[in-house]
């Protein structure tokens, strides 16, 4: 049976070392929809640059992603493990630039750091140092999550997504109440 639903787009942001986790986030979002979409009247849409961006020329690649995806999404799930990513000319990495844009727009950014063991052969010392510096700065200004295994990430996300959806619904309700109160004030002034 059809139902009305508010749709929130969730941008999945991470450097390239977390492909399995990116898929797990997509699965967690689909699982959330299967369990909660009807009761909450909310549908979550996973968005990734590799599936939702459009090729564009004569534009900085991250700028195209920012315009096409970052500006259009409602929630960001950002993850890091062994690296920060590639400098964009504006920020330390594409993921960092996406997070910065979300925070500047006042939109929720849920950040997670993987504690999964690292194969020494995969370590890029420069990237690891950049990640540690970013992590240290982030801990000063944000409450972040962590996860070890992919299953743990899915489990944590199921709880965090519910809390985030309820916060967004509450914020939307508050905006609606504020608009009604403002309209009532205008009507009162017009009657004077």
Residue ranges, per PLM feature:
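Alpha-helical structural signal in soluble globular domains
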Residues: 24, 28-35, 101, 133, ...
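Solvent-exposed loop/turn segments at secondary-structure junctions
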Residues: 17, 53, 83-85, 116-119, ...
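A short helix->loop->beta-strand "cap" motif at the edges of active sites that frequently abuts
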Residues: 104-114
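Conserved N-terminal substructure of TIR/SEFIR domains
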Residues: 1-79, 105, 181-192
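C-terminal interaction surface of TIR/SEFIR-family domains
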Residues: 115-192
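A general structural detector for well-ordered alpha-helical segments in enzyme core domains, enriched
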Residues: 65, 95-98, 130, 134
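Conserved TIR/SEFIR loop-to-helix hotspot centered on a Trp-containing motif
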Residues: 57-61, 82-104, 123
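Generic beta-sheet signal
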Residues: 49, 79, 112-114, 147
């Amino acid at each position: 049976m059809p139902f009305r639903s508010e749709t929130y787009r969730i941008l999945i942001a991470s450097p390239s070392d977390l492909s399995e986790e990116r898929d797990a986030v997509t699965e967690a979002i689909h699982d959330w929809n299967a369990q909660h979409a009807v009761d909450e009247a909310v549908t979550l849409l996973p968005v990734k640059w590799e599936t939702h961006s459009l090729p564009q020329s004569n534009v900085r690649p991250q700028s195209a992603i920012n315009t096409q995806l970052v500006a259009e999404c409602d929630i960001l799930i950002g993850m890091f493990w062994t690296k920060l990513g590639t400098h964009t000319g504006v920020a330390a990495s594409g993921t960092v630039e996406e997070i910065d844009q979300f925070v500047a727009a006042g939109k929720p950014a849920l950040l997670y750091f993987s504690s999964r063991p690292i194969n020494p052969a995969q370590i890029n010392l420069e990237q690891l140092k950049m990640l540690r510096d970013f992590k240290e700065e982030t801990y000063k200004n944000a409450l972040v999550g962590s996860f070890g295994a992919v299953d743990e990430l899915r489990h944590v996300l199921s709880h965090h997504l519910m809390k985030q959806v309820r916060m967004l619904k509450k914020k939307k309700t508050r905006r609606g109440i504020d608009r009604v109160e403002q309209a009532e004030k205008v009507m009162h002034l017009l009657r004077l």
